[in-house]
Curated annotation (Swiss-Prot):
Protein name: Protein Smg homolog
Superkingdom of the organism of origin: Bacteria
Coiled-coil residue windows: none
Cross-referenced Pfam families: DUF494
Gene name, Swiss-Prot/TrEMBL: smg
Family: Belongs to the Smg family.
Length: 157
Protein backbone atom coordinates (compact mmCIF):
# COMPACT_ATOMS: atom_id res chain seq x y z
CA UNK A 1 0.00 0.00 0.00
CA UNK A 2 2.77 2.45 0.90
CA UNK A 3 4.38 1.99 -2.52
CA UNK A 4 1.08 2.95 -4.16
CA UNK A 5 0.80 6.02 -1.92
CA UNK A 6 4.35 7.08 -2.78
CA UNK A 7 3.69 6.59 -6.49
CA UNK A 8 0.51 8.67 -6.32
CA UNK A 9 2.16 11.41 -4.30
CA UNK A 10 5.17 11.67 -6.59
CA UNK A 11 3.15 11.34 -9.81
CA UNK A 12 0.19 13.59 -9.09
CA UNK A 13 1.00 15.86 -6.21
CA UNK A 14 4.70 16.51 -6.21
CA UNK A 15 4.83 16.82 -10.01
CA UNK A 16 1.88 19.28 -10.10
CA UNK A 17 -0.01 16.94 -12.43
CA UNK A 18 -3.78 17.10 -12.77
CA UNK A 19 -5.07 15.86 -9.40
CA UNK A 20 -8.70 15.58 -10.51
CA UNK A 21 -8.69 12.04 -11.90
CA UNK A 22 -11.63 9.65 -11.80
CA UNK A 23 -11.09 6.77 -9.37
CA UNK A 24 -11.70 4.10 -12.04
CA UNK A 25 -9.21 5.77 -14.37
CA UNK A 26 -6.70 6.03 -11.55
CA UNK A 27 -7.19 2.38 -10.58
CA UNK A 28 -6.62 1.31 -14.20
CA UNK A 29 -3.48 3.44 -14.45
CA UNK A 30 -2.09 2.00 -11.21
CA UNK A 31 -2.86 -1.54 -12.41
CA UNK A 32 -0.99 -0.83 -15.64
CA UNK A 33 1.92 0.45 -13.54
CA UNK A 34 2.05 -3.00 -11.92
CA UNK A 35 0.29 -2.47 -8.60
CA UNK A 36 -2.00 -5.11 -7.10
CA UNK A 37 -5.74 -4.29 -7.04
CA UNK A 38 -5.96 -4.89 -3.26
CA UNK A 39 -3.03 -2.56 -2.60
CA UNK A 40 -4.57 0.08 -4.86
CA UNK A 41 -7.88 -0.14 -3.00
CA UNK A 42 -6.15 0.12 0.39
CA UNK A 43 -4.16 3.16 -0.74
CA UNK A 44 -7.22 4.94 -2.15
CA UNK A 45 -9.16 4.24 1.06
CA UNK A 46 -6.20 5.55 3.09
CA UNK A 47 -6.22 8.77 1.06
CA UNK A 48 -9.99 9.12 1.40
CA UNK A 49 -9.76 8.78 5.18
CA UNK A 50 -6.94 11.34 5.18
CA UNK A 51 -9.13 13.79 3.30
CA UNK A 52 -11.91 13.27 5.85
CA UNK A 53 -9.74 13.45 8.98
CA UNK A 54 -9.08 17.18 9.09
CA UNK A 55 -12.84 17.81 8.99
CA UNK A 56 -13.63 15.48 11.88
CA UNK A 57 -14.48 16.31 15.46
CA UNK A 58 -10.83 15.71 16.37
CA UNK A 59 -10.36 19.48 16.48
CA UNK A 60 -12.49 19.72 19.63
CA UNK A 61 -10.12 17.81 21.91
CA UNK A 62 -6.92 18.79 20.09
CA UNK A 63 -7.78 22.48 20.41
CA UNK A 64 -8.37 21.96 24.12
CA UNK A 65 -4.80 20.76 24.72
CA UNK A 66 -2.67 23.24 26.63
CA UNK A 67 0.27 25.00 25.01
CA UNK A 68 3.48 23.17 25.87
CA UNK A 69 1.71 19.95 26.84
CA UNK A 70 3.49 16.66 26.11
CA UNK A 71 1.96 13.91 23.95
CA UNK A 72 1.80 10.56 25.74
CA UNK A 73 1.78 7.63 23.33
CA UNK A 74 -0.51 4.63 23.74
CA UNK A 75 1.09 1.15 23.90
CA UNK A 76 0.04 0.32 20.31
CA UNK A 77 1.60 3.60 19.12
CA UNK A 78 4.83 2.87 21.01
CA UNK A 79 4.97 -0.56 19.39
CA UNK A 80 4.86 0.87 15.86
CA UNK A 81 6.56 4.27 16.20
CA UNK A 82 10.25 4.10 17.11
CA UNK A 83 11.91 6.54 19.49
CA UNK A 84 13.45 8.15 16.40
CA UNK A 85 10.01 8.67 14.82
CA UNK A 86 8.49 10.03 18.02
CA UNK A 87 11.47 12.35 18.46
CA UNK A 88 11.10 13.62 14.91
CA UNK A 89 7.40 14.31 15.46
CA UNK A 90 8.32 16.31 18.58
CA UNK A 91 10.98 18.19 16.60
CA UNK A 92 8.45 19.04 13.87
CA UNK A 93 5.99 20.30 16.45
CA UNK A 94 8.64 22.40 18.21
CA UNK A 95 9.73 23.80 14.82
CA UNK A 96 6.06 24.64 14.16
CA UNK A 97 5.91 22.47 11.07
CA UNK A 98 3.20 20.46 12.83
CA UNK A 99 0.62 21.60 15.34
CA UNK A 100 -1.33 19.35 17.71
CA UNK A 101 -4.02 18.69 15.09
CA UNK A 102 -1.66 17.81 12.22
CA UNK A 103 0.50 15.72 14.59
CA UNK A 104 -2.55 13.64 15.52
CA UNK A 105 -3.56 13.23 11.88
CA UNK A 106 -0.01 12.07 11.06
CA UNK A 107 -0.04 9.51 13.88
CA UNK A 108 -3.48 8.28 12.79
CA UNK A 109 -2.33 7.88 9.17
CA UNK A 110 0.96 6.23 10.15
CA UNK A 111 -0.82 3.61 12.22
CA UNK A 112 -3.13 2.87 9.26
CA UNK A 113 -0.16 1.87 7.09
CA UNK A 114 0.15 -1.87 6.61
CA UNK A 115 3.75 -1.85 7.84
CA UNK A 116 4.71 -3.48 11.14
CA UNK A 117 7.65 -1.12 11.66
CA UNK A 118 7.36 2.48 10.59
CA UNK A 119 10.67 3.99 9.52
CA UNK A 120 11.68 7.64 9.70
CA UNK A 121 11.46 8.03 5.91
CA UNK A 122 7.89 6.65 5.99
CA UNK A 123 7.01 9.21 8.64
CA UNK A 124 8.48 12.08 6.62
CA UNK A 125 6.45 11.18 3.53
CA UNK A 126 3.25 10.74 5.53
CA UNK A 127 3.81 14.14 7.15
CA UNK A 128 4.16 15.67 3.68
CA UNK A 129 0.96 13.96 2.50
CA UNK A 130 -0.92 15.18 5.57
CA UNK A 131 0.32 18.75 5.27
CA UNK A 132 -0.53 18.80 1.56
CA UNK A 133 -4.11 17.81 2.41
CA UNK A 134 -4.74 20.17 5.33
CA UNK A 135 -5.92 23.62 4.24
CA UNK A 136 -3.72 26.44 5.50
CA UNK A 137 -0.63 24.24 5.87
CA UNK A 138 1.16 25.46 2.75
CA UNK A 139 4.10 27.02 4.64
CA UNK A 140 4.47 23.96 6.85
CA UNK A 141 4.39 21.74 3.75
CA UNK A 142 7.13 23.83 2.15
CA UNK A 143 9.26 23.58 5.31
CA UNK A 144 8.78 19.82 5.41
CA UNK A 145 9.60 19.51 1.72
CA UNK A 146 12.85 21.39 2.32
CA UNK A 147 13.69 19.10 5.24
CA UNK A 148 13.05 15.96 3.19
CA UNK A 149 14.72 16.99 -0.05
CA UNK A 150 17.67 18.89 1.44
CA UNK A 151 18.51 15.83 3.52
CA UNK A 152 18.20 13.46 0.56
CA UNK A 153 20.42 15.75 -1.52
CA UNK A 154 23.08 15.60 1.18
CA UNK A 155 22.73 19.25 2.15
CA UNK A 156 23.26 19.86 5.85
CA UNK A 157 22.24 23.13 7.47
Amino acid sequence: MFDVLMYLFETYIHSDADVMVEQNELTDELSRAGFDKDEIEKALNWLERLANLHDSEREVYVAASAQGSMRIYAPQELARLSTECRGFLLFLEQAQVLNAETREICIERLLELDKPDIELDDLKWVVMMVLFNVPGSENAYQQMEELVFDESDGVIH
